A protein has these predicted regions:
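Structural beta-alpha unit
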Residues: 1, 24, 77-114, 151
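Small/aliphatic-rich secondary-structure junction motif
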Residues: 1-58
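General small-molecule cofactor/ligand-binding pocket signal
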Residues: 35-37, 90-94, 145
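Short secondary-structure boundary segments
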Residues: 38, 117-119, 148-149
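Short, hinge-like loop/turn segments at secondary-structure boundaries
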Residues: 52-55, 108-110, 132-134
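A short acidic, glycine-rich active-site loop
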Residues: 56-73
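Short, flexible loop segments at boundaries between secondary-structure elements
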Residues: 141-151
């Protein structure tokens, strides 16, 4: 059975290019699927809300519902595009830091590749800031395909 392709997707034009590439990869491997992953970190001030007794727990649940409501149409459009190309697609909204979330999903699903888009930052910018493709390339046990930004 083919291994799923894990796609990091945030709705940007860069992730749209990554979606196109993931669809092509999937079509080149009959039977493979795409797991479209949207990662979102909870705001730092709400991290205590993981404890149900924390006063911020309700605020975190409200925040999560708002984010889900906002990103659902975007994720639906992306999944519909992949499915229209004949690729079975699953959508996941993961509440975690993107690099950790994408690696976890890829390992749990037995994926052979993580596909992400690049916003065109060079290696220095990637090394200085939190740049998901750069971090994945240097830390992931799962191979990573970085799709360049298309102007």
């Amino acid at each position: 059975m083919p291994h799923p392709i894990v796609l990091g997707y945030d709705g940007s034009s860069c992730s749209a290019a990554a979606l196109d590439e993931a669809v092509e990869l999937s079509r080149d491997t009959p039977g493979s699927t795409i797991v479209l992953v949207y990662c979102h970190e909870p705001p730092p001030g709400l991290s205590c809300a993981l404890d149900p007794g924390c006063a911020a727990a309700k605020a975190l649940r409200d925040y999560e519902r708002r984010v889900e409501h906002e990103v659902e149409p975007m994720l639906h459009r992306a999944a519909t595009k992949a499915r229209a190309a004949g690729v079975e697609t699953e959508v996941l909204l993961v509440w975690d830091e993107p690099v950790r979330a994408l690696e976890d999903v890829a390992r749990k699903r037995g994926s052979r590749v993580i596909v992400v888009g690049s916003h065109g930052e060079g290696p220095i910018a990637g090394a200085l800031g939190r740049h998901t493709p750069f971090e994945l390339l240097h830390h992931s046990d799962v191979p990573v395909l970085v799709v360049p930004h298309r102007h």
